[in-house]
Amino acid sequence: MEIEPQPDGITCGPTCLHALYRFHGLRVPLAQVIDSVQPLEEGGTLEVLLANDALARGFDATIYTFNLNLFDPTWFAEPDVDIAAKLRARAARKRGKKFGVAVEAYCEFLGRGGELKFTDLTRAQLRGLLRRGAPVIAGLNVTYLYRHARVSGPHDDPDDVHGESCGHFVVLTGYNRDDRTIAVADPYVPNPVAEEQLYWVHIDRVIGAILLGVMTYDASLLILERES
């Protein structure tokens, strides 16, 4: 799995998306992907905004979400629930620009034919997704993944007392059953885990980091396939 270093502190998402495009045979410059993915006003992006870019390029996109800030578990209990309508109804009662962007992006995602799933994130599920052979973009809490101090200020300086945890995108590329580790392709380099961009992390830590991504509107997995 090849992944380029992210050019700055806020382009981890497009850099991961670029790696998946390259894996699936789409050759496009990283700068073009960065320009085409919708950013958030405060920097960074959302997994669903990555998915919308992929849908616009002719991919099939599936998001596994664990984000209870946006979704209610009961919406997935029956097959005929209009999730877009539920999201808009929630947006009418809940303020926040980031929330509004997320709602509109998910409505676009569903309208374009994107598939949204809500499941239990278990070892078996994650292993099963990786055994398909295609890489998976994970939106997660990188403070938990790195076991690094929280950060504060415009330069994300370490601040264990006053800081906040951070969201991040990485690509999950494989599983080692002998030591139960996940292969991670990380666009952020250097990082506190390894000197290289490709490293292995125990599956339980990866699962914890994904679920804690709910703190930063992440907590999701994105899988792309080329349309047949």
Labelled PLM ranges:
Residues P5-C12, V81-I83, H162, R180:
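Short, mixed-charge, low-aromatic patches
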Residues V28, F118-L121, V201:
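Short coil/turn linker and secondary-structure boundary residues
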Residues P29-Q32, L49, K98, Q125, ...:
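Exposed alpha-helical structural elements
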Residues T45, L49, L121, G167, ...:
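Short, well-structured alpha-helical interface segments that form or flank functional binding sites
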Residues L55-E164:
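Predominantly the structural core of cysteine protease catalytic domains
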